[in-house]
Every structure is written in structure tokens, then in C-alpha cells.
Amino acid sequence: MVAYWRQAGLSYIRYSQICAKAVRDALKTEFKANAMKTSGSTIKIVKVKKE
């Protein structure tokens, strides 16, 4: 059985982004501000020192 998102021609990452946006849009206004604040992604890059 093929997943529905695969049948629609989506990658899993794109599918999860669409689902997350739908959930954030459905939230009540009192919870929406916190959800929008945490919806961004954070990446930390660390360079390894060679000794």
C-alpha cells in the first residue's frame, strides 16, 4: 500500500510542512502566537578544531 502523500507526488518533508501549517491555521488565536513563534527552524553549525 502506497502512502497518500506519495500518491499525490509529495515528499514526506513537504507533506509534513503542509500538515503543520494546517494545524497552526486551525489553532485558536490565543495559542496561534506561540505556535507561529516556534514554527521557524533553528540550525547551529559547529566547526571542529583539528589539533
Swiss-Prot record:
Keyword Amino-acid biosynthesis: no
Originating species: Bos taurus
Entry function: Subunit epsilon, of the mitochondrial membrane ATP synthase complex (F(1)F(0) ATP synthase or Complex V) that produces ATP from ADP in the presence of a proton gradient across the membrane which is generated by electron transport complexes of the respiratory chain. ATP synthase complex consist of a soluble F(1) head domain - the catalytic core - and a membrane F(1) domain - the membrane proton channel. These two domains are linked by a central stalk rotating inside the F(1) region and a stationary peripheral stalk.
Tree of life domain: Eukaryota
GO cellular component: mitochondrial inner membrane; mitochondrion; proton-transporting ATP synthase complex
Protein name: ATP synthase F(1) complex subunit epsilon, mitochondrial
Disulfide pairings: none
Modified residues (N6-succinyllysine): K21, K32, K37
Gene giving rise to this polypeptide: ATP5F1E
Ranges annotated as spanning the membrane: none
Membership in a protein family: Belongs to the eukaryotic ATPase epsilon family.
Pfam families: ATP-synt_Eps
GO-annotated biological processes: proton motive force-driven mitochondrial ATP synthesis
Broad class of the protein's primary localization: mitochondrion
